[in-house]
Amino acid sequence: MDSGKTFDSISNDLFLEILLRLSTKSIDRSRCVSKQWASILCSQDFTESEKFNFINASSFLFSSTKLINYKGKLGGIDLAYNHGGVYPVELRMWVLEDVEKHEWSRHVYSLPETIEFQQCNYNICVGGMNAIGFEDYLNRRVYAFVDYVEDLSVNDAMQLKSSSLQNG
């Protein structure tokens, strides 16, 4: 049996699956098996790699914290509720400032007491809102988002009371 024909008959997908299960040393030795294998091993798709790290996020104690992209940085937002756990009283946001040092900045926004909130599966729901222009979606849920979190320089005390803390 011609060994060159056998190696060439193995599909690239099967070959990649085999290589992913081998050690680096074994992969390096297999470059000399055939020209096709050597070209696959040198291709950018095979040699690219990503580095992942774990981040200490002790600020996120609750499962209701949502991870967000805040101006290109990792952020997390959640709501603090009153003692009954029904009405949100604070919107809290953490932003990862330094990945290496695990430094987080914390921003707390006190929600106005004048707004009537409704319990809505751990989301902020405000009573008395009207959706206009969504006739095609009458039988579906409509979500309205207020963009206070994006603008940390809001100075209107009637809307938000902000305190910025450094959390290391």
From Swiss-Prot:
InterPro entries for this protein: F-box-assoc_dom_typ3, F-box-assoc_interact_dom, F-box-like_dom_sf, F-box_dom
UniProt-listed Pfam families: F-box, FBA_3
The F-box domain, residue ranges: 5-52
SUPFAM superfamilies membership: F-box domain (SSF81383)
Domain of life: Eukaryota
Protein's name in the database: Putative F-box protein At1g30945
Classification of source organism: Eukaryota, Viridiplantae, Streptophyta, Embryophyta, Tracheophyta
